[in-house]
Amino acid sequence: MSDFQKSFSESTSSIKFDEKYIDNSVQPNDIGVADQWAVKTVDDPCVGNLATPVNSGYFTKAFINNLPFYREGISPNFRGLETGAAFGYLLYGPFTMTGPLRNSEFAVTAGLLSAIGAVHIMTALLVLYNAPGKAPNVQPPDATVNNPPKDLFTRAGWADFTSGFWLGGCGGAVFAWLLVGTLHLDTLMPIIKNIWTAG
């Protein structure tokens, strides 16, 4: 304890307030509008995690807790499969439409191979996160996620998530490739390619 703190803790004199600054109409149990929306610490104020109307709101909590990474009752492998499928599916379009081969006849196949390559790179990063010598970082409960999945943040759980991510990512890219190859999209592909043509 510093000398500055000691002077306050050892002081025997009572604190006196100036009467003109005291509002007698406010009672200790009154909750004002500002107090209802005040930012409060979640657990430990030193961590810096605050419960704000954004991260602890109903919509945000419902949205985040329904993502496959935090949804309750599914295995780590299925979490990875669902997350990877979304990544692979969403990566295929930008690689196909804006890739260097976008104006060639190989654009569809090049987009597929690029998306699968990106999924492989992300899978390698997930494997490195679970490298020997360190355990996965266990997320504590916070204002948005009250109950993070315990089975995911183990070595075996993270390995299952990674294998599911690889399979889902490759499958999602192949599914997008199959959709682009349908007859319905053959008429739309030249229009979409001309929108993003840069040269």
From Swiss-Prot:
Keywords: Membrane, Photosynthesis, Photosystem I, Thylakoid, Transmembrane, Transmembrane helix. One of its GO terms (cellular component) is plasma membrane-derived thylakoid membrane. The chain crosses the membrane at residues 108-128, 165-185. Pfam families: PsaL (PF02605). It is a multi-pass membrane protein. One of its GO terms (biological process) is photosynthesis. Belongs to the PsaL family. This is Photosystem I reaction center subunit XI. It comes from Prochlorococcus marinus (strain MIT 9215). The gene is psaL.
